[in-house]
């Protein structure tokens, strides 16, 4: 599917371009267009009111390019590239801005399903989410026999869980997220 999917990416004048291009290429996505007007670092963020991937307004130039190239998915990262926003093409030609909870649920389902299909889903699989994030992901995790750990807001608490899993060897970390558009799919 990756070879057929058309993606538009914008770093919103931040540092994410090189990282995002590499990550998308490694994931098998061959058709990635970058919003050139937002590809270089600009401390004034001159083409966007707020460089926040949670905001649909931040996707204006990505949506414009997306319509031009027929993109299926639009991706934006905030200036320091630690939050990722996504919009998906709708049947009517518009783009739907996904919430952090929706992105987290899609990622959890995909990761768990891919591991299940490959026969690599550990019996002690664990996911982490902040306490303010959706419980839908808990239900997704449970449907695969995985355990969900709810932690306080802040990735340092997800990191503490990962460290605990590694020290105790009691769970295998699969992914973690916060509804504020932060995701971590592999231990660091």
Task: Give the predicted meaning of each segment.
Residues 1-188:
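Phosphate-binding chemistry for phosphorylated carbohydrates and sugar-nucleotides
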């Amino acid at each position: 599917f990756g070879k057929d999917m058309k993606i538009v990416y914008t770093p919103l004048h931040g540092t994410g371009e090189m990282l995002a291009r590499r990550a998308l290429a490694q994931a098998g996505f061959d058709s990635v267009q970058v919003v050139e007007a937002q590809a270089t670092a600009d401390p004034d963020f001159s083409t966007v009111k707020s460089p926040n991937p949670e905001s649909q307004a931040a996707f204006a130039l990505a949506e414009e390019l997306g319509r031009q190239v027929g993109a299926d998915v639009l991706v934006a990262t905030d200036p320091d590239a630690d939050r990722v926003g996504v919009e998906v093409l709708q049947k009517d030609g518009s783009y739907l801005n996904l919430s952090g909870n929706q992105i987290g649920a899609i990622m959890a389902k995909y990761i768990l399903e891919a591991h299940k299909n490959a026969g690599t889903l550990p019996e002690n699989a664990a996911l982490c989410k902040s306490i303010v994030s959706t419980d839908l992901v808990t239900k997704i995790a449970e449907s695969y026999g995985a355990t969900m750990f709810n932690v306080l807001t802040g990735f340092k608490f997800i990191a503490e869980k990962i460290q605990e899993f590694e020290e105790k060897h009691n769970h295998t970390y699969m992914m973690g997220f916060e509804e504020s558009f932060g995701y971590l799919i592999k231990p660091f």
